[in-house]
């Protein structure tokens, strides 16, 4: 049996609590509040405010998960509250008996009978004292619990206010920092300097075009942006500073509230820290027990002297018992007084917290206007800040335009190279490789039919035929011009390098060069990745290049040895590709055999040939270097010059890297000019760095020598392996020669790197010379600085002399001002005394007239608000009608509600699923205009507040400020009264009173036509709405029948789709076609007999079948299965070589899926 859990409810004003067992039996927050209303005796549930621990508002859906709820009365949070409400919480319904001293031992009799009777009476008094003290103890403990509960309630409401304030303050601070950042980095004052510097930039040449960076900017637009920012940015900053001051004041007031609560808590600790209730009650119980024990001992033992017991009780026990009881009673009174004080002072705390929240609510509303789009007419709004940001961005182009233009050049070149490789390297190679695969299949089928076709003709009269698909891979779409500012200019890599040098030599920021170099390196990396993809695609055809005899040999060898020689496969594929390329070359040379004479086409391909990339430089006749990896021999190489072209591209990349390194060194040299104070130290560090580099060079030479020895040893091993390989497989000797040439090429690269290193050393030497020249420049600048300091001292002495003269003149003027001000004060005092004598009577009459005028104005304003609220309710009725497809119309003088189609399509913009409101400012009904006309009298009252003149003071302060009234103010009061009477007569007492006309129209009781005659629904709007609901209910029944029919059709379609094969977006339950596939493994595996099966897909690669039983797929060419589970895997650097985690030898970063499927039989 489990223990019950309870929800504890605390009254925040009295500290009392009650418990409710969980789960809570109330079904809604309203029911729960009505229960609390009966407990707290509150007149309305709207006055209840509920909080949970840590200042969180009550979420009724989680009420069974809570332990505590604090209940507050909203009536005590206002600036003015009803004292009766507070007295309701401070009233105490219990009283305690004040202890009285014992009178039983006051007698001085010595008779044993009288002494015995007195002792028994004293024992009864002690028992009564103990009983009263026990009751007082319980009440005191209850008061302690109540005080602690009130303190917890104060902490809870303070945490609630703190959370509310901090949330708004956090949002405000983020926007304030944003505005401060704009103000700090604003360029509206200094943009002209940057613009002039940009104008000094020389033209940059790209091909035959010259580009002036300043031409991209519009001077008039820049001037307009600067003017707009200068006129509006200070207003925005001032607005946010004002809001920041308000938030700071709220923070200070919040600290004051916190200190007030802390002071109350410390006061309670200091007042009651010396009283220990448990020890006090222990003393009382002990004394009472001693009195009782003595009497029992006297009655049981005659040897005890009665007079001594009497004396002990009279002088010790009874006085001590009385003193402790009085101390307990005083402790109780102190607790009750402190609780009453705490309850009253907590009201001021609640009021302060409410005021803080109101201030933060105003901050929140102002912040919402400034940070979200709205229709506010305030000159400082969200649109203003956005416009300032846009103009600041445009002004920043004066500084960032060189960097932006460089990014545009690099991106245009990167897109060009990507498109060039994709269209000419990838697409064309895919087409060629697919054609090669089809040719291999044609050859295999031809051989197979040659061997077994005759036997098939014996079984059937039909001649066996075969057909294969044709492949046509074409590039659809044209290149899109992304950057219009460059027009049709073709950007080369050399142009980018020249532009980086152009920026470095200009007055642009030094970070621009670093960023441009980084983006340029990213361009090279992107192009190299496309090259790798092209090489991979170029080797696809080799996987199907083995003949039938070779396949049978490899399969038999696999049975014997358990593995396949992938090198042999690659070499065979290479030979087949060379033969095919020689055949194509022969066809190309002699394709025009009908024309005479026949000539070889030795002319280099033109720039329009779509088989070559435009970014590859002219080819050089060099020997093709061998590949260290046999797989790379599958790269498309029709002639030797193709490899030399790739080699030249690599050399170009190396030259570019060296040039970028030189640019970086120049940048470091230019930075040395600004490092005046640390120049010598930088020079020493540079020398030390050169020494370290020399040591590193020596170490690299040693490492290079060791690597070269290892390479020579590996080369000897490879030569031996190739010799054995050549003997076994009769490989062409050209492969060995290519490997030897590659080694020679590596030696040439090493020598070239040594030359580059010597070139860098020469550059360091020139840098040392430049440092010496800079030192001389710094010494001359220091001399000029000393001359400037002497000139500054002379100017300061002249300024100090002028300040002494001005101070003397200022002192004389100040003395004259003091004399004149004293005379003015005397005259002012005489004038005020005179006015007090003559204005006392007139002031009282003026104040009476002013009070009456204020009453009239308040009544008219209240009637105006009442009429506006009635009109808003009428608009709400119109919104409700139109959301239901009904429209309020007027036919002649009769009002009707008619059914209109098309109104429900006008849905709200904020919530497209909400069909209850229409997203327009005003409903479509024309009757609203007539009702609005009848409210024209409201505009007359709208200016009543402006009629009032400035009142010197209220009636309570009339005697203090009576000297400020005069005859002119009296005339103003009278004229004001006449105007109010005129307005009242015009609206309410004229022949055709406007107010009566408005009431007659807005009531809709005359000249109305009901939708249907009904004795129950005779109201105009209720009648139309009830009829509309009945129509909708009938439509819903018909719609339900149609939905059932549609559901039956959907079930039929789902049954049909269950037998369709899925090709992408595989999910559990899909029917999938699995085909055996071949995985190119980078490493040899022990068990190659396992056949991988891949799902037939379109755009969803790497879905492999989980084969638990090899007999399941044995001797099958395909399998159809229903997916039972899909396990996602990813190849990482850690599991790339693990066959259990990467059984299909996929590349690092590839996500593949292991599919468990149940075979379906049809």
Curated annotation (Swiss-Prot):
Protein name as catalogued: Autophagy-related protein 11
GO BP, sorted A to Z: autophagosome assembly; autophagy of mitochondrion; piecemeal microautophagy of the nucleus; protein transport; reticulophagy; ribophagy
Keywords assigned by UniProt, alphabetized: Autophagy, Coiled coil, Membrane, Protein transport, Transport, Vacuole
GO molecular function: molecular adaptor activity; protein kinase binding
Biased composition (Polar residues): 634-648
Species in which this protein is naturally found: Scheffersomyces stipitis (strain ATCC 58785 / CBS 6054 / NBRC 10063 / NRRL Y-11545)
Family: Belongs to the ATG11 family.
Recorded coiled-coil stretches: 563-591, 659-760, 798-870
Domain of life: Eukaryota
Biased composition (Basic and acidic residues): 961-971
Location within or outside the cell: Preautophagosomal structure membrane; Vacuole membrane
Function: Involved in cytoplasm to vacuole transport (Cvt), pexophagy, mitophagy and nucleophagy. Recruits mitochondria for their selective degradation via autophagy (mitophagy) during starvation. Works as scaffold proteins that recruit ATG proteins to the pre-autophagosome (PAS), the site of vesicle/autophagosome formation. Required for the Cvt vesicles completion.
UniProt-annotated stretches for the region Disordered: 620-648, 949-971
Membrane topology designation: Peripheral membrane protein
GO cellular component, as recorded: Atg1/ULK1 kinase complex; phagophore assembly site membrane; vacuolar membrane
Subunit structure of this chain's protein: Homodimer.
Xref: Pfam families: ATG11, ATG17_like
Predominant location: membrane
């Amino acid at each position: 049996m489990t223990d019950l859990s309870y929800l504890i409810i605390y009254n925040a004003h009295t500290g009392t609590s009650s418990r409710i067992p969980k789960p809570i039996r109330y079904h809604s927050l309203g029911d729960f509040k009505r229960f609390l209303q009966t407990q707290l005796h509150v007149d309305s549930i709207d006055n209840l405010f509920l909080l949970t621990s840590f200042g969180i508002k009550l979420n009724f859906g989680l009420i069974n998960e809570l332990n505590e709820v604090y209940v507050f009365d909203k009536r005590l949070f206002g600036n003015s509250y009803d004292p009766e409400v507070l007295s309701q919480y401070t009233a105490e319904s219990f009283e305690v008996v004040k202890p009285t001293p014992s009178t039983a031992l006051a007698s001085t009799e010595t008779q044993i009978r009288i002494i015995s009777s007195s002792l028994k009476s004293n024992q009864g008094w002690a028992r009564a004292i103990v009983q009263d003290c026990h009751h007082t103890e319980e009440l005191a403990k209850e008061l302690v619990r109540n005080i602690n509960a009130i303190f917890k309630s104060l902490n809870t409401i303070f945490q609630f206010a703190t959370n509310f304030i901090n949330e708004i303050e956090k949002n405000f601070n983020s926007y304030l920092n944003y505005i401060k950042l704009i103000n700090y980095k604003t360029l509206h004052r200094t943009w002209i300097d940057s613009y002039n510097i940009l104008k000094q930039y020389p033209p940059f040449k790209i091909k035959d075009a010259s580009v002036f960076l300043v031409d991209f900017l519009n001077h008039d637009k820049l001037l307009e942006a600067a003017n707009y920012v200068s006129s509006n940015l200070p207003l925005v900053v001032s607005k946010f500073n004002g809001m920041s001051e308000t938030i700071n004041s709220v923070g200070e007031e919040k600290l004051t509230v916190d200190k007030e609560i802390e002071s109350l808590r410390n006061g309670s600790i200091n007042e009651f820290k010396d009283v220990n209730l448990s020890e006090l009650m222990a003393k009382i119980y002990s004394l009472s027990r001693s009195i009782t024990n003595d009497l029992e001992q006297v009655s049981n033992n005659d040897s005890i002297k009665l007079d001594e017991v009497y004396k002990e009780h009279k002088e010790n026990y009874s006085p001590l018992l009385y003193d402790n009881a009085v101390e307990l009673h005083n402790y109780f009174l102190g607790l009750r007084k402190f609780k009453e004080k705490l309850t009253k002072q907590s009201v001021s705390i609640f009021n302060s917290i409410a005021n803080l929240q109101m201030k933060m609510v105003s901050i929140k509303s102002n912040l919402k206007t400034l940070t979200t789009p709205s229709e506010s007419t305030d000159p400082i709004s969200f649109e203003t800040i956005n416009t300032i940001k846009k103009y600041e961005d445009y002004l920043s182009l004066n500084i960032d335009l060189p960097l932006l233009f460089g990014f545009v050049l690099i991106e245009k070149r990167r897109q060009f190279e990507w498109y060039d490789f994709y269209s000419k390297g990838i697409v064309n190679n895919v087409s060629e490789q697919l054609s090669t695969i089809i040719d291999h299949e044609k050859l295999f089928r031809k051989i197979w039919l040659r061997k077994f076709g005759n036997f098939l003709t014996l079984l059937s009269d039909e001649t066996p035929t075969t057909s294969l698909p044709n492949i046509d891979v074409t590039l659809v779409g044209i290149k899109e011009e992304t950057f219009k500012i460059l027009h049709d200019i073709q950007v080369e890599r050399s142009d980018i390098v020249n532009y980086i040098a152009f920026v470095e030599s200009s007055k642009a920021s030094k970070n621009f060069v670093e960023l441009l170099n980084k983006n340029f390196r990213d361009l090279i990396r992107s192009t190299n990745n496309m090259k790798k993809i092209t090489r991979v695609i170029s080797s696809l055809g080799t996987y199907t290049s083995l003949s039938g005899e070779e396949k049978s040999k490899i399969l038999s060898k696999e049975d014997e040895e358990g593995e396949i020689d992938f090198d042999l496969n690659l070499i065979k594929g290479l030979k087949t590709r060379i033969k095919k390329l020689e055949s194509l070359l022969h066809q190309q040379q002699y394709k025009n055999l009908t024309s005479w004479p026949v000539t070889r086409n030795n002319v280099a391909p033109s720039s329009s040939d779509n088989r070559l990339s435009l970014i590859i430089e002219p080819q050089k006749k060099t020997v093709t270097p061998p590949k260290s990896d046999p797989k790379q021999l599958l790269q498309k190489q029709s002639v030797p010059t193709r490899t030399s072209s790739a080699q030249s591209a690599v050399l170009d990349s190396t030259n570019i890297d060296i040039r970028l390194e030189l640019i970086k060194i120049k940048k470091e040299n230019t930075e040395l000019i600004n490092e005046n104070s640390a120049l010598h130290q930088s020079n020493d560090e540079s020398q030390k760095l050169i020494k370290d580099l020399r040591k590193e060079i020596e170490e690299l030479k040693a490492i290079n020598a060791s690597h070269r020895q290892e390479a020579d040893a590996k080369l000897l091993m490879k030569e031996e392996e190739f010799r054995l390989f050549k003997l076994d497989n009769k490989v062409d000797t050209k492969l060995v020669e290519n490997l030897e040439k590659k080694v020679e090429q590596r030696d040439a690269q090493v020598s070239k790197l040594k030359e580059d290193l010597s070139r860098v050393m020469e550059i360091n030497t020139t840098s040392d010379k430049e440092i010496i020249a800079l030192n001389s420049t710094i010494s001359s600048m220091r001399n000029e600085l000393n001359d400037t300091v002497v000139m500054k001292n002379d100017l300061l002495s002249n300024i100090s002399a002028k300040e002494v003269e001005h101070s003397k003149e200022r002192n004389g003027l100040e003395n004259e001002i003091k004399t004149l001000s004293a005379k003015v004060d005397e005259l002012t005092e005489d004038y005020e005394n005179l006015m007090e004598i003559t204005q006392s009577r007139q002031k009282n009459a003026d104040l009476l007239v002013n009070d009456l005028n204020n009453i009239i104005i308040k009544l008219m304003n209240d009637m105006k608000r009442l009429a506006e609220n009635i009109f808003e309710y009428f608009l709400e009725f119109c919104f409700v009608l139109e959301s239901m497809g009904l429209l309020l119309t007027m036919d002649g003088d009769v009002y009707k509600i008619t059914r209109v189609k098309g109104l429900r399509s006008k849905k709200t913009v904020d919530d497209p699923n909400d069909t209850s409101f229409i997203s327009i400012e005003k409903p479509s009904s024309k009757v609203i205009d007539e009702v609005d006309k009848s409210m024209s009298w409201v505009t007359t009252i709208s200016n009543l507040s402006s009629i009032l003149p400035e009142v010197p003071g209220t009636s309570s302060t009339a005697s203090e400020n009576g000297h400020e009234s005069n005859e002119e103010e009296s005339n103003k009061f009278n004229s004001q009264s006449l105007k109010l009477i005129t307005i009242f007569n015009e609206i309410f007492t004229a022949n055709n009173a406007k107010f009566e006309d408005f009431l007659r129209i807005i009531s809709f009781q005359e000249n109305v036509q009901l939708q249907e005659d009904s004795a129950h629904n005779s109201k105009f709007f209720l009648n139309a709405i009830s009829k509309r609901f009945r129509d909708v209910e009938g439509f819903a029944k018909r719609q339900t029948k149609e939905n059932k029919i549609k559901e039956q059709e959907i079930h039929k379609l789902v049954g049909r789709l269950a037998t369709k094969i899925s090709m992408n977006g595989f999910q559990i339950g899909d029917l999938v076609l699995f085909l055996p596939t071949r995985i190119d493994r980078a490493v040899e595996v022990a068990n190659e007999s396992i056949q991988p099966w891949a799902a037939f897909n379109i755009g969803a690669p790497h879905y492999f079948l989980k084969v638990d039983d090899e007999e399941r797929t044995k001797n099958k060419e395909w399998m159809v299965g229903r997916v039972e589970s899909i396990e996602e895997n990813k190849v990482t650097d850690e599991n790339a070589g693990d066959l259990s985690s990467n059984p299909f030898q996929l590349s690092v970063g590839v996500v593949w899926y292991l599919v468990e499927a149940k075979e379906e039989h049809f």
